[in-house]
């Protein structure tokens, strides 16, 4: 698993093309040949860009679900709804299909935000609202999520 780092602001053109920021492109260089999967986020009004290797790992996990359990089948259908294989073109751009532009309410300004091993693509205004929102106290969230983690190998502080 490659860890991706950084948050970058970009412009999207009228055709839905976004120039991938150079530092991000360098981090994803090993994935450029294999391509990427672009999908709707489950929890947020943004898109998720998976390097193909990460997507294949996710699909291996999902493939273990019993499809004769209705809940599993419904999840698979919704999780993969609108999924697109995308590539970085010769000019370093990603084409965001119109249905996904609509889902994420992308206008002119977008944010590429690293999320461990994938990249979230947000409309800039929605991104700002999400990280600055008063609906979540980040200190409380950090304590709830990471407060009881006891990682003896790597020493999470």
What would you call each of these model-derived segments?
Residues 1-9, 14-17, 24-91, 99-157:
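Flexible "stalk/tail and boundary" regions
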């Amino acid at each position: 698993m490659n860890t991706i780092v950084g948050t970058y602001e970009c412009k999207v053109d009228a055709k839905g093309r976004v120039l991938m920021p150079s530092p991000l492109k360098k981090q994803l260089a090993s994935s450029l040949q294999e391509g990427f999967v672009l999908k709707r986020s489950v929890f947020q009004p943004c898109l998720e860009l998976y390097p193909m290797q990460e997507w294949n790992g996710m699909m291996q996990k999902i493939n273990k679900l019993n499809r004769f359990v209705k809940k599993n089948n419904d999840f698979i259908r919704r999780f993969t709804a609108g999924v697109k294989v995308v590539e970085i073109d010769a000019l370093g751009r990603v084409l965001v299909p119109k249905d996904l532009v609509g889902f994420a309410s992308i206008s002119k300004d977008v944010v590429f935000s690293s999320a461990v091993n994938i990249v979230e693509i947000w409309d800039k205004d929605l991104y700002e609202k999400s990280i600055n929102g008063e609906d979540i106290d980040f200190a409380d969230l950090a304590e709830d999520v990471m407060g009881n983690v006891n990682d003896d190998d790597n020493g999470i502080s």
